[in-house]
Amino acid sequence: MTEAKKSLKRTLIGKVVSDKRAKTVTVLVERRVKHELYGKIVSLSSKYHAHDEKGEFKTGDVIEITESRPISKTKNWVVTRLVQKAEIV
């Protein structure tokens, strides 16, 4: 097989809302969908726990997470890269 296999792992982009736990960040992923019956655009959000080995991501950072093997009871995602650093206020 000379063709590279396409990765079946999902990747999502979201905002870090909590970095209080060791090696773990909580990521809020928002998506906008159209309601089937009424046609209104609705914002839906989900929170994911992602593994941050070095503890380098802080609250407010926009990051990309990738699906992985289960790391703990609630952690099935790994942080892959920083998209945007948090603004300092």
Swiss-Prot record:
This is Small ribosomal subunit protein uS17. One of the primary rRNA binding proteins, it binds specifically to the 5'-end of 16S ribosomal RNA. Keywords: Ribonucleoprotein, Ribosomal protein, RNA-binding, rRNA-binding. SUPFAM superfamilies: Nucleic acid-binding proteins. It comes from Polaromonas naphthalenivorans (strain CJ2). Belongs to the universal ribosomal protein uS17 family. The gene is rpsQ. InterPro entries: NA-bd_OB-fold (IPR012340), Ribosomal_uS17 (IPR000266), Ribosomal_uS17_bact/chlr (IPR019984), Ribosomal_uS17_CS (IPR019979). One of its GO terms (cellular component) is cytosolic small ribosomal subunit. GO terms for biological process: translation.
